[in-house]
Structures are given as structure tokens and as C-alpha cells.
Amino acid sequence: MHEQERDVAKKWKRYNVQLAIIGIENQTAVEKKMPFRLIGYDGASYKSQLQANAASIAPVVTIVLYFGEKHWCKERNIKSLMNIPKELDPYVNDYKMEVFEIAWLTDEQLEMFKSDFKVVARFFVNKRRDPDYVADDPTEIQHVDEVLKLLSVMTGDRDYEKVICDEMKGQVKSMCDVAERLKNIGRQEGRSEERINAVKFAISLGASEEKILKQYSKEEYEKALALMKA
């Protein structure tokens, strides 16, 4: 797909024969004109198959995974988004998009998943039910990096990326471990902020750099200076 970029594109094959192209779009917010964007992606997929002189054209299926806490409230087909003269309506092809509201899945639907996505979906369901929810899912995660990156993007919380970079990342096996690492990172950042504030206070009292560096690092001193000048 050269003309447009999808979030995820997969080829569905059986016995080495391509049966379909599956496109997946991840959304955290409702987008009014989403059906038009998807028909553009699908059109680009068909065009690329034509340009490749494929012996047969594989069908293209695009689904939207919506992670928002409110129901998708906008139209899901392009005809609903246009003012079409009734004389032309029979000749205008419609396009309907499939939206899966992840945060609104039932417990029975969650149990249907067998991959790491079950952990991700359950997290968003619980977050929607309780905004103060702290991850407590003991299910072992097979692909920790991928799950944490997805959570970081879909929640807008960069702390999940910090867990990926943390030297203790290897000990993270479940969302329970993730919650514990986030708690520790929060403590460390809190202590770091306290130390920076202490350096700023010492500078404001006129303490010399030499004296401050006896108790604090050069990095802490320079960061405190930069914050005071900002």
C-alpha cells in the first residue's frame, strides 16, 4: 500500500494461497469521517494488487479497533455522511465500516481471545468500568514490549514505555508486574523531583556550586539551574 499507510495490515493465507488482506485501524477517539478514510485504504490495497498484476484479486477487509470509553457515536457508512439527491441514490455505492468497541466487550467476549490481546482488551474494559482501576491481571504476557507499546499509544501514558526501558523489564511477566514497576518508577521520579527542588532551594540561598555538588550530582545541579532560568 504505497498511497496510504495503515496501522496494521495482514495477509490471510491458507495452504500458501492468499485469501484476503486484513487491515486494522486503532482508534482512541471517534472520527466522524472515518468511513471515507477506510475506503481510501481499501482502494489503495486493490490498486496495489492491480499494479502487481496479481493472478486473482484478494478481498480487502478493514476493521476498526476503538479503545475509547464512550460508545462510537458517529455514522459507520459513507452514505450517511453525504447529501445525495434521491435521483442519484440508487447509483451511489455505499461503504460500511466495522467498528469493535474494545472497552465495551463483555466478559464472555473477552474469554474468546487466546492471545496477548485478551490482556489488552481486559485492561480497557476494566478502565472503562472503573477509572481508578489498577492493573491486577495475572495472565502471563507473551510479547511484553508489544503490549506495553500498544498501551502507551492507546492510553497516551508514556510511563508504559519507561517500563520497557527499565533494567528490570525482564522480570515483567504480567500486568500485575507492570503495575508494580509503574509504582516503583513513580517513587523514583518523586525522589528525583524532591532532590531537584532541594538543589533549587540551595541555589536560591546563595550556596556555591562546589558546596552543592558535595551532596548532589552535576546533572541534578544543571537541571535545577535550567528550571530556574526557564
Short names for language-model regions:
Residues 1-230:
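Elongated, amphipathic alpha-helical interaction scaffolds
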